[in-house]
UniProtKB/Swiss-Prot annotation:
This is RxLR effector protein PITG_14788. It is found in: Secreted; Host cytoplasm, Host cytoskeleton; Host nucleus, Host nucleolus; Host cytoplasm. The RxLR-dEER motif acts to carry the protein into the host cell cytoplasm through binding to cell surface phosphatidylinositol-3-phosphate. Induction: Expression is induced during host plant infection. Belongs to the RxLR effector family. Effector that enhances P.infestans colonization of Nicotiana benthamiana leaves. It comes from Phytophthora infestans (strain T30-4). One of its GO terms (cellular component) is host cell cytoplasm. Coiled coil: none annotated.
C-alpha cells in the first residue's frame, strides 16, 4: 500500500514539472500573437514607405518635365541674343561697302586697344564686331579675305603696330586662330610683295629697330625670329 502511494506521488510530481502552467501558456500565446502583429505592421509600413517614396519620385519627375517644357535653356536664350546682335551688326553694313569703311561702321576703330596688350588685342580680335567684319571681308574678296583685312588694319594702325598686334594675338587662345591667319598674310606680303628676303630687312625697314642691338628689343626680336622661320620654310618649299 505504501509502495502504491509512493508511485502516485512520483507521477504527480512529473506531471507538475512537464505540464506548462496556464500563465506560461497564456504568455506564450500573447508573445506569438505580438510577433505576428509586428510582422504585419512592418510589412504594411514598408509598403507605405515604398508608396510614399515612389510618389515623391514621380512628383519630382513631373516637376522636372514641367521646368524643361516651360523654361528654355540658357544656351538657347544666349544663342538667340547673339544671333539677334549679329544680325543687327550685319544690317549696319552696305553690301558693297569698302572694308576700311566697314571697319569704322562696326565701330572697331573706337575700341580701346593697346598694340602690345595681350588681353586687349585678344578681346579686339575675338569680338563679335571683328567677326562680322571678317564675314564682310569674305564677301569682298573670298580668295584672300585676310589679305584684305591686313591692308585695312595697316591703314588704321600702321604696319609695325599690326605686326605687334598679331604677335600678342597669338598668345591668347581666344584670338590665336585669326592672328595666325593674319600673320600668314603679313609674312606672305613681306616676302612676295615687298621682297624682304631676310628677317634682318623686316627688322630694319618694318620694325624700325637697330639690328646691332637686337637683344635689346623684346617683341621685335620675336617677330624677327618668326619671320626667319617663315623665310627658311618658304625657300625650302620653292
Amino acid at each position: 500500500m505504501k509502495s502504491l502511494h509512493a508511485v502516485n506521488l512520483v507521477l504527480l510530481l512529473l506531471l507538475a514539472c512537464f505540464a506548462p502552467a496556464p500563465a506560461t501558456r497564456e504568455l506564450n500565446l500573447r508573445a506569438a500573437a505580438s510577433d505576428s502583429t509586428r510582422v504585419v505592421d512592418n510589412a504594411t509600413t514598408e509598403r507605405l514607405l515604398r508608396a510614399h517614396s515612389s510618389g515623391k519620385e514621380e512628383q519630382k519627375e513631373e516637376e522636372e518635365r514641367a521646368i524643361s517644357i516651360n523654361f528654355p535653356s540658357l544656351e538657347k536664350i544666349l544663342k538667340n541674343v547673339t544671333s539677334g546682335k549679329s544680325t543687327e551688326l550685319q544690317g549696319m553694313l552696305k553690301a558693297d561697302e569698302a572694308l576700311g569703311s566697314a571697319f569704322k561702321t562696326l565701330k572697331l576703330s573706337t575700341m580701346r586697344i593697346g598694340k602690345d596688350d595681350t588681353k586687349m588685342v585678344a578681346k579686339f580680335l575675338s569680338s563679335r564686331n571683328f567677326k562680322i567684319w571678317f564675314q564682310h571681308a569674305v564677301k569682298i574678296n573670298k580668295d584672300d579675305p585676310y589679305g584684305e583685312m591686313l591692308k585695312a588694319l595697316t591703314n588704321v594702325f600702321g604696319e609695325k603696330n599690326v605686326a605687334m598686334m598679331i604677335l600678342v594675338g597669338n598668345l591668347s587662345r581666344n584670338s590665336r586662330d585669326v592672328a595666325k591667319k593674319l600673320e600668314k598674310a603679313q609674312f606672305y606680303k613681306w616676302y612676295f610683295v615687298d621682297k624682304y628676303k631676310t628677317a634682318d630687312e623686316v627688322f630694319t625697314n618694318v620694325l624700325k629697330a637697330d639690328r646691332n642691338r637686337i637683344h635689346g628689343y623684346g617683341r621685335e626680336k620675336e617677330i624677327w625670329g618668326d619671320y626667319a622661320k617663315y623665310v627658311t620654310t618658304t625657300v625650302m618649299k620653292y
